[in-house]
Amino acid sequence: MGKLFGTDGVRGVANEYPMTAEMALNIGRATAFMFKREGHNPKILIGKDTRLSGYMLENALVSGICSMGVNAILVGVIPTPGIAYLTSSMRADAGIVISASHNPFQDNGIKIFSGDGFKLPDETELAIEDMILNNKMDQLLPRVSELGKAYRMDDARGRYIVFLKHTFPRELSLEGVKVVLDCANGATYRVAPETFYELGAEVTTLFDDPDGRNINVNCGSQYPETLAAEVLKQGADVGFAFDGDGDRLIAVDEKGNVLTGDQVIAICANVMKKEGKLTKNLVVRTVMSNIGLSVALEKLDINSIMTKVGDRYVLEEMQANGSSIGGEDSGHVIFLQHHTTGDGIVTAIQVIAAMKKEGKPLSDLAKIMDVFPQTLINVDTKSRPEISTVPELVAVIKSVEEKLGTSGRVLVRYSGTQNMCRVMVEGPTQEETLKYCKQIADVVKEELG
């Protein structure tokens, strides 16, 4: 990671460094310059989620892009994967998303996609960062006659919905299927309901009234309880919860049980293997994946490899090893046969397609994987020293690992997008994992909080 760019772009509290209008303008300028080339009329797409600060950052980005002689196309509110798709399909030079994903509305972020729909490689992000931090842009500004223009794109949502529907097998139908959607008052609030309605489902929608401040507030993929209750109330077949920018998914079965991202991966990988679409017979998972996923895949005779947390690292391993599916327990799942990045709506469509193909309710499909007891505690931190350099923390981790032996594991890592440390413990019982996780979290808070 650089000084500005983390594992998922630039993030921070809106109107505070680095998420200021001035920084957004500079990111726009630097990004535009990176994609300019002689004899070409470049264009950059800009999309956002529903945060209040999105207006400020959007206009600043446009100013920066146009000041460098590049055209900006404003898409408006659309899920992050929608920008990835549109950037590629429209042959734009780059796409920029203004969002902080599952974070509260006070936060915002900027992430950038290349013209092929993939997130920018680290070296390009570092080059943009270098231009900004070392004030290299003033001498690069074009003449007034060469300034760029800004346009609004009115049919972006419709184009994206057409793409989404094409990921659902044409021979299947959702007629008579009851679906409940939790849109987190975020970027999916119009796209997701319209997509499932057009596929023939009976749709009930929750948290689809964004006001700029209510994104992710007690709703969405991190708070699926209301969705689960509504699925039971409606007698629905399935429920889907998205996060604020629509790149992750949490599913709820017809009995109100909440599935993890790992369970979704196991279900979809099994169907893909049966259809001969699981390339290299390989699934990419992360260090945060539940042990149960590895066990389930082994029983299915499916190979898996593990990588660092972060969808960009999952994607890198998928591309390097020829895998067609990979993801995180948090609900980021990448289907490379369909998309270049994690897409919550695409994932939901693949889950419901699996239900139709297998002819089983989601509760039965979920039995493919036993979820091992796991506790995760996030601790706000003021500093981020290497874990191995904090003696008290090293000692408590070692103590817990010795007590768990081969029946569990401990993972302590810093978040790549927020100032916090994540403590995860897996073990034989929920009581033990909670007890040990609290022990470690208390030390983290004392030493780093």
Curated annotation (Swiss-Prot):
Enzyme class of the recorded protein, top EC level: isomerase
One BP term from GO: UDP-N-acetylglucosamine biosynthetic process
KW Transmembrane (keyword) present: no
PROSITE patterns tied to this protein: PGM_PMM (PS00710)
Pfam families: PGM_PMM_I, PGM_PMM_II, PGM_PMM_III, PGM_PMM_IV
Keyword annotations: Isomerase, Magnesium, Metal-binding, Phosphoprotein
Name the record gives this protein: Phosphoglucosamine mutase
Gene designation per UniProt: glmM
